[in-house]
């Protein structure tokens, strides 16, 4: 998948004197049915999460608290997305190399996924990722 298919999506934000409320709905705010959710927290300083690509899984990543950067790579181009608001999320289609870095203290990342966990969907080696996706996406 090429980076132009990535989308930073603003979620609804309802505010009143009691605080704020945001939400997401499948096929309305994100373009897939949610099959799995997980969250990342207590990441030690300097650690990297991710470092993989998916053959089929799509994700929507939100910073519920704190901040972190999502580095995306389509095998030719790279782009960094900084997430630091709980009412913005990043849609990441399948076929992109993904890393999450620069976690602030007490950050909390929520990830919704389009597939159930399947280890065979993961690509952990960057060169394998490039050989699978670069030719298909960029004709390289």
Descriptions of predicted regions:
Residues 1-88, 105-108, 112, 117-127, ...:
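Non-catalytic, conserved peripheral segments adjacent to functional cores
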Residues 85-90, 95-102:
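Well-ordered alpha/beta subsegment
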